[in-house]
From Swiss-Prot:
Binds to multiple calmodulin (CaM) in the presence of Ca(2+) and CaM-like proteins. The gene is IQD12. It is found in: Nucleus; Cell membrane. It comes from Arabidopsis thaliana (Mouse-ear cress). May be involved in cooperative interactions with calmodulins or calmodulin-like proteins. Recruits calmodulin proteins to microtubules, thus being a potential scaffold in cellular signaling and trafficking. May associate with nucleic acids and regulate gene expression at the transcriptional or post-transcriptional level. This is Protein IQ-DOMAIN 12. Transmembrane segments: none annotated.
Length: 404
């Protein structure tokens, strides 16, 4: 059976238990503090140990790497030494073999040099022979050409005419070349003068001309140069067409020994004045435009009253232009201003004239010229015949007017 406990016992127990509990709690706290203090140095020691281990592993790795690098360098050095030794051995062997090869090729090289020198000498000889052959061919061909030319000159019947033709062509070429050069010089001078005039117009100029007047003068000069060039081209074409006839006429005139140039020019001027007084207005040979207009008015006035049938004006204009071109051509070229008659000129005048005009003018003129020869000049016979015809026409016109 259990013993009964009093309240006093219970109180003791409580107090005693609390005291025990407090006594027990104090060492537990102390233990916990001591444990913490113990754990801290343990943790520090663990960290130090881990650090030392890592450093040791790193040192080991570095050492291993250094050892590997050293071994690799040693291996490379060994390989390089082996290669160098192999090259030395090879060079030594090549030197030995090259010495043997040079000793073997020395006579071959000497033979090649001898062959090249011999071939060069042969090539030089061949070139000299070819040059000599070319010279011989040139000499032979030149002699053959000279023989042909001499044979042609001997066989030609008109040797003098051919030489005169050649001389005339050369002189004409020189003349035309001079004219072209002169035209170029004139153009250059005109351009230079225009530039100078422009410069002067910008500044002070003592002349009374204005800028417009200077430009107008320059334009007129250029137009004159262009017209001159055209006329020269036209005369050249006409001369090329009529050159054989003119050359024959000039040679014939030289052989016949006609009068001087001044007398012929004076005779031409006199005959032209006399022709203008009695020829038909459609066949007038007047070079000026004023006389042509007056004659055309007379033609239009007389055509209604006169009984004669005049030809068309187209023929007169064509004939007049041709004769003007011929007169200008004779003046522009280096020929003498005389008029020599040929069959071609006679046929031309007949083709251009009408049947009524063919009867008494040109045929009688040419016949008289053939009969007289050197004694009577062409212009004198022409003037005499034309004066007779003019008198006859005037008398017929007066009789017709009286009858009307």
């Amino acid at each position: 059976m259990a013993k009964r406990r009093s309240w006093f016992g219970w109180m003791k127990r409580l107090f005693i238990c609390e005291a025990k509990a407090r006594a027990e709690k104090k060492p537990r706290r102390l233990r916990w503090v001591f444990k913490r203090l113990k754990l801290r140095p343990q943790l520090a020691t663990c960290g130090q140990e881990t650090r030392t281990l890592n450093e040791a592993t790193q040192d080991q790795r570095k050492h291993a790497m250094n050892v590997a690098i050293a071994t690799a360098a040693a291996a490379e050095a060994a390989v390089a030494a082996a290669k160098a030794a192999a090259e030395v051995v090879r060079m030594a062997g090549n030197a030995f073999t090259s010495q043997h090869f040079v000793k073997k090729l020395a006579p071959n090289v000497a033979a090649i040099k001898i062959q090249s020198a011999f071939r060069a000498s042969l090539a030089r000889k061949a070139l000299r022979a070819l040059k000599a052959l070319v010279r011989l061919q040139a000499i032979v061909r030149g002699r053959a050409v000279r023989r042909k030319v001499s044979a042609l000159l001997k066989s030609s019947h008109s040797n003098k005419a051919s030489t005169s033709n050649i001389i005339q062509r050369q002189t004409e070429r020189k003349h035309w070349s001079n004219t072209k050069s002169e035209i170029k010089e004139e153009l250059q001078v005109s351009n230079h003068s225009l530039c100078n005039s422009k410069v002067k117009c910008n500044g002070w100029d003592s002349s009374a001309l204005t800028k417009e007047d200077i430009k107008a003068i320059w334009l007129r000069k250029q137009e004159g140069v262009i017209k001159r060039d055209r006329m020269l081209k036209y005369s050249r074409s006409q001369r090329e067409r009529r050159s054989p006839h003119m050359l024959v006429e000039s040679l014939y005139a030289k052989d016949m020994g006609m009068r001087s140039c001044r007398l012929e020019h004076w005779g031409e001027s006199k005959s032209a004045k006399s022709i203008n007084s009695f020829l038909i207005p459609s066949e007038m040979l007047v070079p000026t435009k004023v006389k042509l207009r007056s004659l055309q008015r007379q033609d239009s006035g007389d055509g209604q009253d006169s009984p004669f049938s005049f030809p068309r004006r187209s023929f007169s204009r064509l004939e007049q232009s041709i004769l003007e071109d011929e007169s200008w051509f004779q003046r522009s070229n280096g020929f003498q201003p005389y008029m020599s008659v040929t069959e071609s000129a006679r046929e031309k005048m007949r083709s251009l004239s009408t049947p009524r005009q063919r009867v008494g003018i040109m045929d009688s003129l040419f016949d008289n010229y053939k009969k007289d020869g050197d004694k009577v000049s062409l212009w004198s016979t022409f003037v005499c015949e034309n004066s007779k015809i003019n008198n006859a026409k005037k008398s017929s016109l007066t009789t017709y007017q009286h009858n009307c």
